[in-house]
């Protein structure tokens, strides 16, 4: 068994066994798998598998289950698409100012990822917009109008070589 402490769970100790880790790894690879197929793969009864999955959801091990769209296909459908990786440095880095920018950034639907980073810029954003006019509108809304934004450096994707969502889990 692997004991994991996480302050996000109010310091409640959660214990994951080998079956829980296999279940999480399988769901990371394909969350659309049916409970029966998942149970068969893990050699569990369907009821036990469902109970474990619900527990992992309730404890916060699984944040959400989504369908990941092909950015290439969506780009073809729309005729274009712009992905920008943006470094943002703030003028003042007090906790309340960092939190204020973060709150505004995560409310933007164009922002797919928002990371506080160190050293270097204060934030890294991954932004997906349909075209350059939409990018300009986004930057004016989030970056230009914020007096605390000191520096912005944007990089535009010309090719996505890899995109993954799986987290490497320990083996029991």
In which residue ranges do the predicted regions lie?
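A compositional/biophysical signature of low hydrophobicity enriched in polar/charged and small residues
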Residues: 1-172
